[in-house]
Amino acid sequence: MRNFRLDDESGHQEALFSWAAYRTEIMPELQYMYHVPNGGKRDKATAAVLKRQGVKAGVPDIMLPAARAGYHGLYIELKAGENTTTKKQKEWLEYTAVCYGWQPAAQLIEQYLLHSDELTKEQETVTMR
């Protein structure tokens, strides 16, 4: 895996998807993991078009559509450093894991895909640092 700038969320996200590409042989479901590009700065016209097309504020960054342990997929909100969740993101948190950095996200994904039968309710709802 190459070195990534880990001073912001985009670097952590690139590192996570690089890790996922490397681990796909062990966890084939990783090939279906994707980023939801809701964030970022956009002009008003583009933002209005995207909103009409279904873009919603607060939707988690990463989706892994693999059913496990009674869940229909894993949503991850990826944070870096001291960044915190927004008000809109908090509305989604009942259905989302918040991971501070790519390594905790990778750890959660492995736990979810390989050992979901061992997940406890606390692990399912915990914010990982």
What is the role of each PLM region?
Residues 1-129:
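Catalytic phosphate/metal-binding cores of nucleic-acid and nucleotide-processing enzymes, i.e., regions
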